[in-house]
Amino acid sequence: MKVFLAPVLLFVFASVVDAQVLDLWPQGKVAFGVYAPSEAPRGSPPVYTSEGAAKVAENPLYDFVFLNLEGAYDPVAVKAYGQGLKKSSRKTLIVRIPPISKDGPETTRARVQEIFDAGADGVTIPHIRDLEEAKLALTFFEAAKANVWSPANPKGTKLAMLMLEDPKAIAQRREIAELKGLSILACGIGSLAQALGGDRAGAEAGTQQVLAETKRVKLGNMLPASANDVEQRIKEGFNAILGQGPQADEMIKIGRTAAGR
């Protein structure tokens, strides 16, 4: 599973006071978000526009929007979606890009810079394979001169999110969680299950192990949820809950009640 992902890869369009997620976490509150819905017909390549983003911005249930460009990176979509959200809301925009293993370090570094230049709050880099790749990924945020929010930098205005979806990375979760300049660390439970040969129980165990490390060092941890399990996920301690599709609003309403919001 991909993080469609607790505090985390979000894009912020101004200072920290304008970043809704970063308003909530210091208060110990859970943030709720939604995958940016494609405006294309079902089965067609995704389409994201400023008009579509403006419509999403009208929904008061969402604290953040997760723009998933892992499958096909589109800088035009980043800019358009950011503009649409910014016009009428303070919602945080999180953009997920393809993994380093797909397009290489230089391309990934350039994308992080491009996304922040477009005004986004944060970037999510998925499929971090090990500790060394996690260190490499965080240098991209340094190169972009992003003022990254972290427990050590509570006045930061940008979010750096990494996703662990492979067994080796899960095994190195403690060391990765302790890296400087990290905002959100999440486990891609679906992808991890695939890497484990379909072992859903093993993937859930990995998810809980990553969660425990984020709670230990006070990072954000994001996870998708449904109406059936959102209350449990909040009790477990996830602080960024992601919904998708027509059932997202129902899930968030249940989650907000459970979280005291």
Where are these regions (language model features)?
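Positively charged n-region of N-terminal signal peptides that target proteins for export
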Residues: 1-4
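Bacterial N-terminal signal peptides
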Residues: 6-15
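Expand to "…catalyze enediolate/carbanion chemistry for C-C bond making/breaking, isomerization
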Residues: 17-261
